[in-house]
Amino acid sequence: MSRIQVQGVHHITLVGSNRQSAMDFWQGLLGMRFLFEQPNLGNPNENHLYFDPGDGRLITVFTNESRRDDPSPHPRDIGHLEHIAFNVSRATQTQVAERLQARGIPFKSFDRGFMDSIYFSDPNGLRLELACYKFQTPAGVRDADVLVRADAIRRKAGAHHINEQHLADAIEELMTERDGRRS
C-alpha cells in the first residue's frame, strides 16, 4: 500500500480567546508578523488570524470577541498537544528570560544536550517552547541530518544523551562527506 508522503508542516491552528489577546501575544511578545485576518469559514462566530513565525509557514489563531483568556493548563492526555516549539537565535535565547520576567510570565529553562529550551504558556494555557540549537548547521546539510548523525555517535559511545562533542563530530563527518574529503 502506498504511503502519503508529507513535505513539512503547512500550518498550525490554535483556538484563542479574542483578537486583542492574540495580537498582543503572537505579534507583541513573540514578534510574529501579522499577515492577515478573515472570517473562519468553518464557524461564522470566529475570526481567523494568520501569523508568520519567521520561516514563511503559518501559525493561525481562531478568535471570538466573547471569549476571555483562560490560563488554566491544558490536559496532558493522549491525543492532546503537549507544546509547540519555535526556533530562536542564540542571541535572542540569551534575552528570553529577562524579557519574560519583565512581562511577569513564568518560565522554566532546560539544557537538552543538543539545544537550550525555555518553556512558558500563552494566555490560554498552551505550553510553548523557545528552542536554540547548540550548533550551526553547515550549508547543504539539514538540522535533522546533524541530529541523526550525532545520535548515532552517541549510541556508539554508549552515552545517555547527545552532547556537544557528538554534535561537533557529526558536523565534521557530514562536512567531510559533503565536500568529498578523505580523513
Could you tell me what each predicted segment is?
Residues M1-L14:
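Short, extreme N-terminal leader segments that mark the start of a protein/domain
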Residues Q7, G16-Q20, D77-G79, H83-R127, ...:
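Vicinal oxygen chelate
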Residues V15-I59:
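Core segments of cupin and vicinal oxygen chelate
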Residues N45, R67-S72:
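A short, acidic/glycine-rich surface segment
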Residues G54-L58, S66-R67, A91-Q93:
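Short, charged/polar surface micro-motifs in flexible loops or helix N-caps
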Residues L58-V61, E129-L130:
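Short glycine-/small-residue motifs
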Residues D143-I153:
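Low-complexity, intrinsically disordered terminal/linker segments enriched in charged
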